């Protein structure tokens, strides 16, 4: 998985459907950060979920599961847990003008949980990473701050949002041409850079790091294939973006620019493909 919201949604959904244990959810989240916490952003969200209010303090990982169980209500049905991946210009699924919209857009991800018996009690969860302090004065070289925790803020929503349905078949078809376009662009940019001998090796390194994240056993094979192809295209985009910032020869400058331009629209293809695959995985946990 490529973000905490997807890990939380697919594993919590599987748990609520009886297809996974609570420890499966916790194990999936532990790959993102060693500790998890959850807190209510407002009094209404606290009322829907049982989180502390007004004395706000971060509750632990077990409280995160309790929060989700309270938010979905007694009738656990398909579609109660969903993921949104907002980007500037496309914030579908987010309540306009809310703090949730602002924070979800800043994070680029969020989980929406709806109660089928009470649509007005829907809540949204936005993750935020916490890092330890680095004593720069004591270090001879700059160090990356250590990832300490992942906290989830819970927001009340004005209602259960209408989420767009993404067709898995359409996504798979779009990805086929996206893979070809991305590979061609990588070759063009990589050949123009003398500092990188094996750009495809860099792509494989990115893919390998993402494979540590598990997916529930009920996930459809087609959805897994779409996720794998989307990850491949996304890795190529990331590597190509890095290569395009390296010094290149004058003759290859225009080729590199054309390749970069060709990659730009593929980001939207990857996003739609991932949304369709995640939706299919979420739905597959429940009986038809």
Curated annotation (Swiss-Prot):
It comes from the Bacteria. To M.tuberculosis Rv1486c, M.leprae ML1804 and M.avium MAV321. This is Uncharacterized protein Mb1522c. It comes from Mycobacterium bovis (strain ATCC BAA-935 / AF2122/97).
């Amino acid at each position: 998985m490529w973000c905490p919201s997807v890990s939380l949604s697919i594993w919590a959904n599987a748990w609520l459907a009886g297809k996974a244990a609570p420890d499966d959810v916790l194990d999936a989240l532990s790959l993102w950060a060693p500790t998890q916490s959850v807190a209510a952003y407002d009094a209404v969200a606290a009322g829907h979920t049982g989180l502390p209010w007004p004395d706000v303090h971060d509750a632990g990982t077990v409280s995160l599961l309790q929060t989700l169980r309270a938010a979905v209500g007694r009738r656990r049905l398909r579609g109660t847990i969903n993921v949104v991946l907002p980007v500037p210009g496309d914030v579908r699924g987010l309540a306009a003008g809310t703090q949730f919209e602002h924070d979800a857009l800043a994070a680029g991800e969020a989980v929406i949980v709806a109660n089928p018996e009470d649509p007005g009690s829907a809540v949204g969860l936005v993750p935020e990473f916490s890092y330890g302090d680095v004593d720069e004065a004591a270090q001879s070289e700059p160090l990356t701050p250590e990832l300490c925790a992942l906290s989830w803020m819970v927001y009340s929503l004005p209602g259960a949002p209408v989420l767009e349905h993404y067709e898995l078949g359409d996504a798979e078809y779009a990805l086929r041409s996206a893979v070809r376009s991305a590979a061609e662009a990588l070759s063009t940019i990589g050949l123009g850079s003398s500092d990188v001998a094996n750009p495809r090796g860099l792509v494989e390194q990115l893919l390998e790091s993402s494979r540590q994240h598990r997916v529930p056993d009920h996930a459809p094979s087609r959805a897994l294939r779409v996720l794998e192809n989307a990850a491949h295209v996304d890795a190529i985009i990331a590597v190509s973006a890095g290569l395009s910032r390296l010094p290149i020869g004058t003759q290859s400058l225009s080729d590199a620019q054309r390749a970069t331009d060709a990659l730009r629209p593929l980001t939207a293809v990857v996003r739609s493909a991932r949304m369709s695959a995640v939706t299919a995985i979420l739905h597959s946990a429940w009986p038809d």
